[in-house]
Amino acid sequence: KDEFDKGNYVYTRNFVEALRTLDMVPRQFVYISSLSIFGPIHEDNYAPISERDTAMPNTAYGVSKLKSEHYLQSLNDFPTVIFRPTGVYGPRERDYFLMVKSIKQHIDFAPGFKRQDLTFIYVRDLVQAVFLAIEHGVRQRAYFVSDGNVYFSRTFSDLIQKELGNPWVIHIKCPLFILKVVSLLAEFSARCLGKVSTLNADKYKIMKQRNWQCDISPLVEELGYRPEYPLDKGVKEIIAWYKKEGWL
């Protein structure tokens, strides 16, 4: 929790305060927040999360990102544009790479049995959104970012399997209560060893969330955002990159 607060809020605040103190306020300050600041909402009707909704983060990561947003939005004289991307994937990304490695070994784990709607954003499309905001001189605005599609929980793993050329994969749906116990034990063990566990209480809450839809229409209508990487195209690129760089 402290590390998230330090990395996402304290360092952001210190950097911005230094810019203001030195009279080096930029024309625009782009802050990459997260869809996670809204927490698990609309899980009954699976409606897209929009700017009309109230942010209610349930993770230390989400809380730290929201804290940074509130700080930046309180500075009326500081030109900020905020992006709230959904799951970002691309070359060098390691969290999703763990899933790729697992599927290469013919195992795919999915959290829970209830419907889960997922959204993704390839890093190049996120960069496109950032440059559009810079070109349009956007200030004091926040946008959700995804590739505009909604995917079933199996779609990502099926695409990875296809690009890896795996003839078969065992798909295992893990009950949430088991996943929670494993996450807590992994976090405790890592803490005892002075390490950071990829699987932890925060990660469990993220995997547990069922609705990751978000409304990108303001980004499309105001800035002309046109995502170029649907999931199949993005997965093809990252698998090719992992192979080229010797990760696989």
Residue ranges and their predicted role:
Residues 13-60, 81:
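Conserved Rossmann-fold NAD(P)-dependent oxidoreductase catalytic core, especially the SDR/UDP-sugar
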Residues 69-91:
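Conserved beta-loop-beta element that borders a ligand/cofactor-binding pocket
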Residues 63, 67, 93-98, 112-134, ...:
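Substrate-positioning beta->alpha
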Residues 123, 158, 182-226:
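Conserved C-terminal active-site "lid" loop/helix of NAD(P)H-dependent oxidoreductases
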